[in-house]
Structures are given as C-alpha cells and as structure tokens.
UniProtKB/Swiss-Prot annotation:
Biotin-attachment subunit of the 3-methylcrotonyl-CoA carboxylase, an enzyme that catalyzes the conversion of 3-methylcrotonyl-CoA to 3-methylglutaconyl-CoA, a critical step for leucine and isovaleric acid catabolism. Pfam families: Biotin_carb_C (PF02785), Biotin_carb_N (PF00289), Biotin_lipoyl (PF00364), CPSase_L_D2 (PF02786). It comes from Mus musculus (Mouse). This is Methylcrotonoyl-CoA carboxylase subunit alpha, mitochondrial. The modification N6-succinyllysine is found at K577. SUPFAM superfamilies: Glutathione synthetase ATP-binding domain-like, PreATP-grasp domain, Rudiment single hybrid motif, Single hybrid motif. Acetylated.
C-alpha cells in the first residue's frame, strides 16, 4: 500500500534533522492532521526519480529524504558536478548538455527509472513536467507519474481547448481566437477583428515562451514568426492563439490540489504581476489588496477548473485581474510552480510531500476549512542577467557567493554553490529567496534585508535591481501590475547612477590596505632584503607622502589624491571635496571585510577584488569600482568589431536574415540567437551594406564574437 509505505517511512525517519531550508515559519502541527484520513491501496513508493535539474531537483530531494524515500537524479554532461547530483542517493548520466538530448529524452529517463527500480518519477517544472506523451509513457511502463493524468495535461496544455472547458465550467475567459486554422493570414485577420493590442501565445507550454505583445498590424508578422520559432524550440509545437491584450492587468494565480478520490482544494492565491520578458521575477502570497470575498471567488473558480478535468496533484490556475478585481482565466499549469514556496510559507505545508502522498493514493491531507492562511510571504528570483542590458541572460562561474542565513522565516531555494557555473544551456536562475513575516510590510522589510546579504561576484546578477524594485514606493503600496517595470523604468533602471565619493574612498582604502598586505607578505618571504618591492607604501618617518590613484565608475575615470599621514590615516581628495580616511582589513568566515571611517562615519563592507574590479557589499547596497587597464593590455571592445555587430552572449544562431551584399537599415533584424532558452534578435546598429556574415544557422557563437561585418563607408570628398 503506497500511503502505508510512505507513512511508515516517515515514522522510521521522524528523528532525522529536518533540513533548515524547509523549516516552516511557525511550529504548526499540520503533519499530525495529514494522518487523519484512511489510506487506500496503491503502488508502493520507496524510490523516486527526479526528471529535472537545479533548484527544483534539490527541493524534491530534500522532501524525499525527510520522508525516507530514496532519490534518483539524472544529469547531463554539463551538470556532472552539480548540486542535485551530490544530494541524491543515486545519479545517472543521460546525455550531452543540450536538453533535447538529455532532460527532454523521455526514453532515456524511463530507462533510468527501470534500471534504478524507481517506482515514481517527479518531473519538477519545465522540461517534461507538462508533457502529455511522457505522462502516458510512464503509465504504460507501470511507473507512477507524480502529476495529473495525461488527459488533464492534454486539455489544459492546449490553450484553445482549456478555454472552452473553462467557459463550460463557469470560469470567466478572455475574448480571443483559439481555432484550428493556423495560417498567418487567418491569425492576422482575427487579430484585426479583436483589435490591437493583442497577445500572441503558444497553444502549448508557458513560462513566457512563445509569447509576444503586438501593438500594431505592421509588426504582427515579425512577432508571429518569432513566437512560432520560440514555441517550436521549447514545446515542439508552433501553434498559436490570439487574445485581446488587457493593459496593466494583474497576474493572480491560485494553487490547487486534487486527489484520486475526486476531492479538490485551493491553497489561496499568489500575485505574480511584476515580470520582465513575460516571466515572473518577484511573487507574493497572498495577493495585496484582495478582500476575503474576492479571495473566496478566486479559489472556488480555481477548484471548478480543477474538477472540470478530474485533476490530480499540484496545479495552478492563472487569472488576469483588472483594476476592479474582475478576473479571467488565462491558463492552468499542470505542475508544481516555481513560486510554490510562498504558498507553503503562508499555509505551513510542504507541497512536495502532498504530491508524493497523493501520488501514492492518499486523500488530500487537509479539508478546505483546515487550510490556514497566516502572514505574508515574498519570493525573489535571483538570476544571472544584466538588467541594464534589457535583462540579457548571462553565464559563467560563481566566483564568490554568499547568502543570508536560512531560518524559520527565510528559505534559499538553489541548485548552485560557490564555484559552480551557470550554464548557457539552461535557465539562468541562480536561486529563489523566500521570506515570511506576520504582515506584508514586515515581510517586505525582511526581503530587502536578506537581498542586501545576497552577494554574487563572477557574473552579472539582478540583486541590485530587486532591491530597487522592492523599495519602490508603488511596490511598497501594493500597486502592482504586469506593466510595473516598463512604467517605472527610469526609477528601476536609472541610466546614470553616480557612485558616492565616500564609496570611492572606501575602494581606494581597500586597495591601499591590500597593497600593504601584499608588500608585507613579500617582505616575509623574499631573500632580497634590499628589493625595492619591500618599500612600496611610501611612508617615511616625519614625512607625508602623496600619490594619485585613478579608479573608474562606468566609463568615467575618477582621480583621487591620497596623502599618507604619520598616524596611519589618509587624506583623500576627489574634485574639490576632502576626506579623512582610516581603516583596516579583516577576515571572517573566509571573506575579507573592510572596516573604515570616512570623515568620522564608520562603515563595514565585504571587500572582493577580482579582474581589475573592486566589489563592495554592505547593508547600504553594492558597488563596483574599476581599476583602469592600459589600452595596450585591453581586450577587444565589446562595442563591436570592424563596425559590425557582436554576440551579446554565448548561444546558438537560430536564424540568419541577411547575406553579404545586402543593404540594411538601422534596426533591421540580422540574426536570431537562442541562449538560456530565450530568443534574442540581433538588430543592425546602423544603415549600411553587409560585407560578411560570420555564422550560419545552427552554429554556436561565443560571447563578443563578431557576427556581421559592414562594408566601410566611403568618406565624403
């Protein structure tokens, strides 16, 4: 009996230490209530295979360990040394880095499940989690698929079908075209009838893939083709639907659970309105400003949606909501969501444990009336991306990674450690920072406090952007909607952020003290007592020494006149402002800290020097100050080569629109690159004629590689 096996496993392991990342906000006794219902016959689950990678694989493995269920990981060649491989009881290689040859290879995963004797497969999210064929294949092979039946995945995965089912179930839907005629002309005609702006959406899938907003007929064709390519790449299906685009809506979703006995409940709503590239970046539960009556109606509509397709397991019903709190069905995600931890935090539940128990044949652990809603939770997604460059995803090693401490109201969901690499082949998410407090304002304060403690060096991240976002007055007021980032672009992404002179003094002080440390180390180990490198500080008895230092903020050089004083302090002058500076470096927990006093104001910052850049992290924020490198030592400029275009990141050339000899205008599309599962269009930087195209379709281009070269313009005579 599946449920009995699971309960016995829990009993055997009840004295194990619960991983701190999964400790609940309060010591609720919900686990005792999960055992009130009788068990039902089913297949025994003693071992589960996780058909995924990264943080969600780690998340499932932790709960499996807590329940005494053995875990089996799968990994691609790129993930051989990854965190989820180390955490699992067993791990199996399933192929090369590209997901089509590994994490999307159904037959390989089924074969691993058989050879490892895993009775169940947890698909996580993404990859095969909403693949009807995979769910059906598991059933045929006698393997429990931890998710809904394939019929529910089919009905909810095809958006046109799901809209019809929802309308029949009495769930409000948005006006649109969901027909079988997929010709460009038909879609264009319906877009015109609906009225611009419209949303082009992939019939299958989700996560912002294959989705485009079209504001005029002139741009319809290009956006349609782009959405088709991305949908084909992500879901192997380029069918599209057209919907009326609701300006400044809220994205509100409801967590639901169903079981094999016909029961269904909702675990309240989440607000996921704040997005970039149609992907969520910060989520919260419950949704701000929603009164109990609207909350009940949302939940009941979501349960009707789940029951309409005989839903089993974890699912999310997504709605768009207007300013008057009218809501309309958007789609149903037939899997566990990325943002599920905020629901766990406000309800005191472990949704992965619910998934495993329900898959084993148990009833839903709690009735609707027993599910509590207490406090407020936020989740911030920390990505390897450059917000100042249109959120361009990045890849590379996490040279330095330090995080806030996990406690009963703070969770860090991650699949990487310091020294690991964010791969170009997969989603660039580094971690999810999840916090809980008794009310929204307290939770928001805790989120900002923890973000200040999330320090990353080695690649660009969005941590500073998340700090600006969470500190914006309109966000604090709960006035969120899907256009929040574009509407507040100037506040969230300032074009010129000036570094305070005090921060420049901190960087200069850190470099001087680091120089002294290196000099002392040299003197300690050198055999040449008369080496000039033994005397580099410039300090002499009864003499003040002055030197000029040049640091760089962005593209601007900053000259600091530094005077070494006899008492060990420094006088620094930047422009016409003077500072008295003193301090020291110390080491704590493997990190270097700079303690400084600048004009009598004490500061403490984490100090990291990497690749001619000083990184300072403190509770006031983070800054980067560059150390200029002579031009003859500099690499090729990232602005371009030979007046052409360069690859903004490492990726695959998906489409090439031009050839040598073509004339183009500034803004014309030259190529399409695929990286981090996202499509990026390379535009012409100027008018001109193409001299050379360096890559063909399907080729791999490294970051900063020249893509297209323009002919030299003839000078005016």
């Amino acid at each position: 009996m599946a449920a009995a096996a699971l309960l016995a496993a829990v009993d055997r392991n009840q004295l194990r230490r619960v991983p701190i990342l999964l400790l609940q906000p309060r010591e609720w006794a919900w686990k005792l209530r999960t055992m009130k219902y009788g068990t039902t016959p089913g297949g025994s689950i003693t071992k589960v295979l996780i058909a995924n990678r990264g943080e969600i694989a780690c998340r499932v493995i932790r709960t499996a360990k807590k329940m005494g269920v053995q875990s089996v990981a799968v990994y691609s060649e790129a993930d051989r040394n990854s965190m989820h491989v180390d955490m699992a009881d067993e791990a199996y290689s399933i192929g090369p880095a590209p997901s089509q040859q590994s994490y999307l290879a159904m037959e390989k995963i089924i074969q691993v499940a058989k050879s490892s004797a895993a009775q169940a497969i947890h698909p996580g999210y993404g990859f095969l989690s909403e693949n009807m064929e995979f769910a059906e294949l598991c059933k045929q092979e006698g393997i429990i698929f931890i998710g809904p039946p394939s019929s529910a995945i089919r009905d909810m995965g095809i958006k046109s079908t799901s809209k019809s089912i929802m309308a029949a179930a009495g769930v409000p839907v948005v006006e649109g075209y969901h027909g079988k005629d997929q010709s460009d002309q038909c879609l264009r005609e319906h877009a015109g009838k609906i009225g611009y702006p419209v949303m082009i959406k992939a019939v299958r899938g989700g996560g912002g893939k294959g989705m485009r907003i079209v504001r005029s007929e002139r741009e319809f064709q290009e956006q349609l083709e782009s959405a088709r390519r991305e949908a084909k790449k992500s879901f192997n299906d380029d069918a599209m639907l057209i919907e009326k685009f609701v300006d400044t809506p809220r994205h509100v979703e409801v967590q639901v659970f169903g079981d094999h006995h016909g029961n269904a409940v909702y675990l309240f709503e989440r607000d996921c309105s704040v997005q970039r590239r149609h992907q969520k970046i910060i989520e919260e539960a419950p949704a701000p400003g929603i009164n109990p009556e609207v909350r009940r109606k949302l939940g009941e509509a979501a349960v009707r949606a789940a029951k309409a397709v005989k839903y089993v397991g974890a699912g999310t019903v997504e709605f768009i909501m207007d300013s008057r709190h009218n809501f309309y069905f958007m789609e149903m995600n037939t899997r566990l969501q990325v943002e599920h931890p905020v629901t766990e935090m406000i309800t005191g539940t472990d949704l992965v444990e619910w998934q495993l128990r329900i898959a084993a044949g148990e009833k839903i652990p709690l009735s609707q009336e027993e599910i509590p809603l207490q406090g407020h939770a936020f989740e911030a997604r920390i990505y390897a991306e450059d917000p100042d460059n249109n959120f361009m995803p990045g890849a590379g090693p996490l040279v330095h990674l330090s995080t806030p401490s996990a406690d009963m109201s703070t969770r860090i969901e991650t699949g990487v450690r310091q020294g690991d690499e964010v791969s170009v082949h997969y989603d660039p998410m580094i971690a999810k920072l999840v916090v809980w407090a008794s009310d929204r304002q307290s939770a928001l304060s805790k989120l900002r406090y923890c973000l200040h403690q999330y320090n990353i060096v080695g690649l660009r991240s969005n941590v500073d952007f998340l700090l600006r976002l969470s500190g914006h007055p309109e966000f604090e007021a709960g006035n969120v909607h899907t256009d929040f980032i574009p509407q507040h672009h100037k506040d969230l992404l300032p074009s010129h952020s000036t570094i305070a002179k005090e921060s420049v003094c901190q960087a200069a002080l850190g470099l001087i003290l680091k120089e002294k440390e290196m000099t002392s180390a040299f003197k300690l180990h050198t055999q040449d007592q008369f080496s000039p490198f033994s005397f580099s500080s410039g300090r002499r008895l009864n003499i003040s020494y002055t030197r000029n230092m040049t640091l760089r903020s962005g593209k601007s050089d900053i000259v600091i006149a530094v005077t070494y004083n006899r008492d060990g302090s420094y006088d620094m002058q930047i422009d016409n402002k003077s500072f008295r500076v003193l301090g020291d470096l110390s080491s704590e927990d493997g990190c270097t800290y700079l303690k400084s006093s600048i004009n009598g104001v004490a500061r403490k910052s984490k100090f990291i020097l990497l690749d001619n850049t000083v990184h300072l992290f403190s509770m006031e924020g983070s800054i980067e100050v560059g150390i200029p490198v002579p031009k003859y030592l500099s690499p090729v400029s990232a602005e371009g080569a030979q007046g052409g275009t360069i690859a903004p990141m490492t990726g695959t050339i998906e489409k090439v629109f031009v050839k040598a000899g073509d004339r183009v205008k500034a803004g014309d599309s030259l190529m399409v690159m695929i990286a981090m599962k996202m499509e990026h269009t390379i535009k012409a930087p100027k008018d001109g004629r193409i001299k050379k195209v360096f890559f063909s379709e399907g080729a791999q281009a490294n970051r900063h590689a020249p893509l297209v070269e323009f002919e030299e313009e003839e000078s005016d005579k």
